Amino acid sequence: MARYLGPNLKLSRREGTDLFLKSGVRAIETKCKIDQPPGQHGTRKPRLSDYGLQLREKQKVRRVYGVLERQFHGYYKEAARLKGNTGENLLQLLERRLDNVVYRIGFGATRAEARQLVTHKAILVNDRVVNIPSFLVSPNDRVSVRRKAQKQSRIKESLQLSAQREELSWLEIDSSEMIGTFKFIPERAVISGGIDEHLIVELYSK
């Protein structure tokens, strides 16, 4: 399945919630009718079956983290193999993705921008270049911006925007040095996003 290249706001409207695909400079409600699906029949809200609800939740989480279907299914299988709660394991794996950590630290205004920084070799993990967005960050890993990329205005602007977000307990951030430390893997209770991972587990368990 190819990566979606269409309007990001359309995806948020499809899911009926902000998927954080835009920078957040303006509230998403000022840009589109978030509670109305796209298309000429958007005002109609058909009642979803249990399967429909499960599918929508999976699509929502995939789009939030920018992961393709095959890769997402792979994360689920790995989550099911690990000890503990499968749903929590799944979200923890997604949170450990390098592009997500770069976004959470604030180097990228969106996960898509963070992914681009990674693929363009602007990001270091423990002082070594890593250009794989799906690379899983481990506790105590240091994620930083390469010195020659630190002059990019978009990174500076993103850090200013991220200062307005809620601080995350599992990250230690030094904005002036453009360094973030992934202190520990977050527990489910502190991972935000309005996600019901149980629906995804039910979907894949069939």
UniProtKB/Swiss-Prot annotation:
Protein name: Small ribosomal subunit protein uS4
Residues in S4 RNA-binding domain copies: 96-159
Any single GO CC term annotated in Swiss-Prot or TrEMBL for this entry: small ribosomal subunit
Entry-linked NCBIfam families: PRK05327.1 (NF003717), rpsD_bact (TIGR01017)
Molecular functions per Gene Ontology: rRNA binding; structural constituent of ribosome
Function: One of the primary rRNA binding proteins, it binds directly to 16S rRNA where it nucleates assembly of the body of the 30S subunit. With S5 and S12 plays an important role in translational accuracy.
Key words, A-Z: Ribonucleoprotein, Ribosomal protein, RNA-binding, rRNA-binding
PANTHER family reported in the protein's UniProt record: 30S 40S RIBOSOMAL PROTEIN, SMALL RIBOSOMAL SUBUNIT PROTEIN US4M
Subunit structure and binding partners: Part of the 30S ribosomal subunit. Contacts protein S5. The interaction surface between S4 and S5 is involved in control of translational fidelity.
Entry-linked SUPFAM superfamilies: Alpha-L RNA-binding motif
CDD domains membership: S4 (cd00165)
Highest taxon of source: Bacteria
Any one GO BP annotation for this protein: translation
Source species of the chain: Hamiltonella defensa subsp. Acyrthosiphon pisum (strain 5AT)
SMART domains: Ribosomal_S4, S4
Family label: Belongs to the universal ribosomal protein uS4 family.
PROSITE patterns, per database record: RIBOSOMAL_S4, S4
